């Protein structure tokens, strides 16, 4: 279906009900066959698997987990079958891209300052507690990359822009190069 429906080799295919990621699998397969550079965006609510289902027994708690595993397996199978190069008939072979990123809609990764008025006898203690809670402004269950991607989204930077890790004075700095045209 993808190869028929007005698709070019650099299309972005969107699937809002991705289920087990059939569309992603098909896009990767078509790219391997014709040397295309199609990308896919799959959206799926984390619908829970029935506890009696084979998927659940295999360790998949929701449909998203099934889809991610299918994409991983599809990529691995394509590499095994086609090698790691595409464009067999092309003079210039390019590496086959089987990578993908998974994003989850969630609240901000950053703690939000509590600006409600402080009243009562222990105002200094409450203010000190609020200040101390902001020393590390990233929520405990979040990663550095969660924050990097949140900032990229807020700045309008596409999420497929490469992120580089650079060590500076024993710290990690994330470099995102994106040309903004005004």
Which residues are covered by each model-predicted region?
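A phosphate-binding catalytic loop at a beta-strand-loop-alpha-helix junction
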Residues: 11-30, 152
């Amino acid at each position: 279906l993808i190869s028929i429906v007005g698709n070019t080799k650099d299309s972005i295919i969107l699937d809002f009900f991705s289920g087990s990621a059939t569309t992603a699998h098909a896009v990767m397969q078509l790219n391997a066959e014709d040397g295309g550079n199609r990308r896919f965006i799959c959206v799926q609510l984390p619908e829970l698997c029935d506890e009696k289902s084979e998927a659940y027994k295999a360790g998949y708690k929701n449909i998203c987990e099934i889809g991610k595993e299918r994409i991983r397996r599809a990529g691995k199978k394509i590499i095994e079958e086609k090698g790691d190069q595409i464009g067999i008939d092309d003079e210039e072979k390019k590496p086959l891209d089987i990578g993908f990123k998974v994003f989850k809609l969630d609240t901000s990764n950053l703690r939000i300052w509590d600006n409600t008025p402080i009243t009562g006898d222990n105002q200094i203690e409450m203010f000190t507690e609020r200040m101390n809670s902001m020393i590390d402004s990233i929520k405990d269950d979040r990663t550095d990359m969660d924050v990097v991607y949140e900032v990229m989204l807020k700045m309008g930077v596409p999420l497929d822009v490469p992120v580089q890790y650079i060590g500076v004075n024993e710290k990690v700095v994330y470099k995102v190069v994106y040309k903004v045209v005004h």
